[in-house]
Amino acid sequence: MTLQRVSPDGILDLTIIGGGPTGIFAAFQCGMNNISCRIIESMPQLGGQLSALYPEKHIYDVAGFPEVPAAGLVDSLWKQTERYGPEVILGETVISYRKLENGDFQVVTASGRTFVSRALLLAAGLGAFSPRKLPQLGNISPLEDRSVFYAVKNRADFRDKNVVIVGGGDSALDWTVGLMGVARKVTLVHRMHEFQGHGKTAREVDEAKESGAIDVHLSTEVSAIDLNGDTLQAVHLKRRDGITSRVEADRLLLLIGFKSNLGPLADWGLELVDNAVEVDGHMKTSVDGLYAAGDIASYPGKLKIIQTGLSDAAMAVRHSLTYIKPGEKIRHTFSSVKMAKEKKSEGQNA
């Protein structure tokens, strides 16, 4: 491991708020640019939503990975980054920041801990998120993570079960296909008359329906559930034309999206656009020395995918150098050259 260089006063160069793919890659870019950093992540593990909600979901649109499990992508990003030894603070939520007289930034967490750095990078995704629920089902919290789920964290939870999936977007379609051969039976319910997910996956779902591998109910909503104590037994469906039906179910998988909330970040006085932080072409916010990258950053033409977040991270770290080390000439070093030098140095010190 190449330990990061810390200034004589012990203050790190950059604090990265958020430990998802964007935040992890930002830490790697710090290492590539010879600046020290820390990641502060509110969850108990790195990876953001990929670790918390979709560890077994496969991702197909990250360059260089024809197909990769979400957890595998997080592992690869960290393996790439850990050589630089960034400080990682888990289970801490940053609630406020203050720009000090000397231009440094101090952040405060919900538990009262404070951290100081030369600059600040927001990589907090969409902020805090909570799953959308079906109000007609009332309080189903006692069933959550037992028979009602909002994400697939472990396929074994659905093995040999009668699974009803609600939703018509990418996650619902992906797991309809992904749980075939795992669940005893898969039933997909969507309130619209057509799917909103990726066309290729939608065609796979249509083909599975035609072959009898799954059941699909369009223009249909879940109206109620049957319980035996605290055990799910069945789901009641109601079509738009009023026709009702009952489907046996051991598991109800609600994949109808998440509600995001910037939380305390919304009160930081930053310029906001559509619940995201506005940045310029250098990923700088309206506050000098404070940058944003990934889903939390907004600029014209922004595409909210992992690949874009990684690019944002590289751009933000690169341009943060002008604030962290004012007056110094920024030199670009190709990764192949830098790694060759580091490996040579490691070999000499072994």
From Swiss-Prot:
EC number per UniProt: 1.18.1.2
Catalytic reactions of this protein: 2 reduced [2Fe-2S]-[ferredoxin] + NADP(+) + H(+) = 2 oxidized [2Fe-2S]-[ferredoxin] + NADPH
Positions annotated to bind FAD: 22, 41, 49, 54, 94, 129, 295, 336
Cofactor(s) the record lists: FAD
HAMAP family in the cross-refs: FENR2
PANTHER family, alphabetized: THIOREDOXIN REDUCTASE 1-RELATED-RELATED
Family under the similarity heading: Belongs to the ferredoxin--NADP reductase type 2 family.
Protein name: Ferredoxin--NADP reductase
Organism: Chlorobium luteolum (strain DSM 273 / BCRC 81028 / 2530)
